[in-house]
Amino acid sequence: MDARTPEVPCGDLLQNAAENLLQEVEEHFQALTATLNLRMEEMGNRIEDLQRNVDDLMAQAGIENSIKEATT
């Protein structure tokens, strides 16, 4: 044993526990990130569908041209 680095019996256990905890946190964070990305993509798709439906309704109501003319 080296005199400059004393052995700590519980040091390895503590280090392993800390590494395991960090690994678990990282895995949970990655899962959360994936879930959030999926939900944001789904929300974007729903917004696009809603916009198409609104455009269709406006065209059916005959107000599409009047709104475009008012904004130009």
Swiss-Prot record:
GO-annotated biological processes: cellular heat acclimation
Coiled coil (residue ranges): 12-66
The UniProt record lists the keyword Coiled coil: yes
Highest taxon, organism lineage: Eukaryota
This protein's UniProt keywords: Coiled coil
Recorded GO MF terms: transcription corepressor activity
Transferase found in the keyword field: no
Entry's Gene Ontology cellular component terms: cytosol; nucleus
Pfam family, one: HSBP1
Family statement: Belongs to the HSBP1 family.
Protein name (record): Heat shock factor-binding protein 1-like protein 1
Species annotation: Rattus norvegicus
Gene: Hsbp1l1
